């Protein structure tokens, strides 16, 4: 809490400053048409700007936002006494008083010391490839920078405190350094870092990173870590005290030892190394060693295009078998030479040849007609078979024998194809048998079904009328003289199966197909009915004499009754007359799906709308 006295002092100061600022604003408004001063105008007048800052500070103290300053902080820095007496300073020395409040405060950061020492080759080799540009965005080595990264720090003080300084360069000579020799420069530098720093004239140091975009220390460390550059002070491997480095303090030469030029040219970058173990140091003064060939990884086993793994394994198995067969042939030749200069052994037997040999052995005939095999050949074949069995049993492992006993052997890439291959199905199909020897089922080829109706056209044969019917017609000619026989319907023709010569067909004069009411389907049905009737009539026998007499009697009685009742004969049916204007275009079509969309009145112009 503030005292009442101090609070009154702050209030009086704030009122006085407020009155001065109001007077300034009034004068500014008179000059600028009643406008208030802008921030740029206030910044151009440093006295008024200072008064604004002081007034805002006093208002914050009175409101409690800022604690009141203590007496030590409130004291003017110009009133401070010197810690060292003036007698200790030389007469020509620059006064040691420095206005440190003018310096821009900056956060502590670690500068990469080795950047001035490590060559550019190392930075390129030991850092990942970064795109040089991303676009119009402000960036540094491919990394986008923010607004605060573009602010450069004040160059009033060197950012590198460990940078070696030449003795007496842009520095005020102190009383201690004035009496010392150049040999004790290093000891004086260590001692002056504590006491003599205050007597150095502020100067603008030479920045070695003038080609880089200025950024804050924190972001620079992040960028250095991102680019693979170490930013600590102790991480740079400096020159060791070896024979490669001539002097300790010669920092302008390329460092040797672990990071030599020869190593920088051929070393693998850190992010590509598989092991983090350090490499042995390279002696630059030694002889140049030949570069060893690169040990590249083997190409993966690639299967040929269109081949599976089983086919590849089978081909490898065949190659191994061929190699073993060659070795076996050589063994046979050696055995033949040892046995007494016998001729060369017979060629190796395939599965087919062995099967033929077994069949020959099985074919046992009479001694007179049997083919006697010489004993020498039999003995040689037996020895060879025994040798093959011994080799097979030697090569087979007990586990494989057990597996063979347990389950049947399956065909794989390591088996002989000829041994397991069955008879070709093509040969069996030629014989008309399947695998089991059963006759194959004959399948009919399925093609497109018929789209039109198949009609078998057969000639129709007409038969002459029988004798009794003709006699009856002769007897009744007198009664029916006025009737034309060509126009009358003949029942005998229908019985014989001749339906073509109807009254309609006669009256149409050969053009019944054009003016017939029936459609094509009806014509086809008529044709089939005629053929069936013709067949049925051919099968039937001629009627007996009794049946003929009965029919004649019935017809006579019917005629007599008709004459008695009607007085006159019934008029004959008139033939159908076809108009001369009749045409096939005017014939009504009898469609099968008529009425499928709503009856005959569908889409009709002269029907009532529903």
Curated annotation (Swiss-Prot):
GO biological process: DNA replication initiation; double-strand break repair via break-induced replication; mitotic DNA replication preinitiation complex assembly
Domain of life where this protein originates: Eukaryota
Basic and acidic residues bias: start-end ranges: 28-42, 493-503, 544-573
Pfam families, per the entry: Drc1-Sld2
Family indicated by similarity: Belongs to the SLD2 family.
PANTHER family for the chain: DNA REPLICATION REGULATOR SLD2 (PTHR28124:SF1)
Record-given protein name: DNA replication regulator sld2
Designated gene of the protein: drc-4
């Amino acid at each position: 809490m503030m005292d009442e006295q101090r609070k009154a002092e702050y209030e009086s100061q704030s009122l006085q400053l407020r009155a001065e600022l109001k007077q300034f604003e009034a004068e500014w408004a008179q000059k600028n048409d009643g406008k208030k001063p802008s921030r740029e105008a206030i910044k151009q007048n440093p006295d008024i700007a200072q008064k604004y800052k002081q007034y805002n500070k006093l208002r914050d103290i009175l409101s409690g936002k800022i604690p009141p300053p203590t007496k030590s902080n409130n004291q003017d820095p110009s009133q401070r006494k010197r810690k060292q007496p003036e007698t200790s300073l030389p007469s020509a020395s620059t006064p040691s008083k420095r206005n440190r409040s003018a310096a821009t405060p900056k956060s502590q950061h670690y500068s990469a010391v080795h950047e001035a020492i490590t060559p550019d080759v190392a930075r390129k080799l030991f850092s990942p490839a970064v795109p040089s540009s991303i676009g119009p965005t402000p960036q540094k080595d491919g990394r986008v920078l923010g607004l605060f990264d573009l602010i450069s720090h004040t160059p009033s003080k060197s950012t590198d405190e460990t940078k070696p300084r030449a003795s007496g360069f842009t520095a005020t000579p102190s009383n201690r350094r004035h009496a010392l020799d150049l040999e004790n420069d290093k000891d004086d530098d260590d001692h002056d870092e504590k006491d003599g720093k205050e007597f150095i004239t502020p100067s603008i140091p030479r920045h070695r990173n003038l080609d880089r975009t200025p950024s804050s220390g924190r972001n620079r460390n992040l960028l250095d870590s991102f680019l693979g550059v170490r930013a600590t002070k102790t991480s740079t491997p400096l020159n060791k005290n070896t024979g490669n480095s001539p002097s300790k303090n010669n920092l302008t030469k390329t460092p040797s030892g672990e990071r030599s030029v020869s190593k920088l040219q051929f070393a693998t970058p850190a992010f590509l190394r598989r092991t983090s173990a350090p490499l042995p140091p390279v002696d630059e003064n030694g002889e140049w060693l030949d570069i060893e060939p690169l040990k590249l990884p083997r190409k993966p086993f690639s299967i040929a295009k269109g081949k599976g793994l089983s086919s590849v394994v089978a081909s490898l198995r065949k190659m191994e078998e061929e190699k073993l067969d060659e070795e076996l042939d050589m063994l046979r030749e050696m055995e033949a030479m040892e046995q007494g200069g016998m001729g060369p052994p017979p060629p190796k037997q395939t599965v087919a040849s062995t099967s033929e040999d077994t069949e020959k052995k099985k074919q046992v005939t009479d001694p007179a007609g049997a083919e006697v095999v010489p004993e020498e050949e039999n003995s040689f074949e037996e020895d060879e078979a025994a040798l093959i069995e011994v080799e097979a049993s030697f090569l087979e492992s007990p586990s494989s024998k057990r597996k063979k006993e347990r389950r049947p052997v399956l065909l794989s890439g390591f088996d002989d194809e000829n041994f397991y291959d069955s008879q070709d199905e093509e040969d069996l199909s030629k014989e008309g048998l399947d695998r089991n020897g059963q006759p194959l089922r004959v399948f009919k080829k399925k093609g497109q079904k018929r789209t039109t109706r198949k009609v078998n056209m057969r000639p129709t044969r007409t038969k002459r009328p029988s004798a009794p019917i003709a006699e009856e017609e002769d007897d009744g000619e007198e009664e029916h003289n006025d009737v034309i026989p060509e126009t009358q319907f003949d029942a005998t023709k229908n019985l014989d199966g001749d339906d073509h010569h109807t009254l309609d067909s006669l009256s149409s004069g050969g053009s019944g197909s054009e003016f017939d009411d029936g459609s094509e389907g009806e014509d086809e049905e008529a044709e089939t009915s005629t053929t069936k009737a013709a067949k049925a009539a051919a099968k039937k026998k001629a009627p007996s004499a009794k049946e003929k007499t009965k029919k004649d009697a019935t017809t006579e009685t019917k005629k007599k009754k008709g004459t008695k009742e009607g007085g006159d004969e019934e008029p004959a049916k008139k033939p159908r007359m076809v108009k001369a204007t009749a045409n096939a275009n005017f014939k009504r079509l009898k469609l099968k799906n008529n009425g499928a969309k709503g009856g005959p009145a569908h889409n009709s112009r002269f029907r009532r709308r529903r």
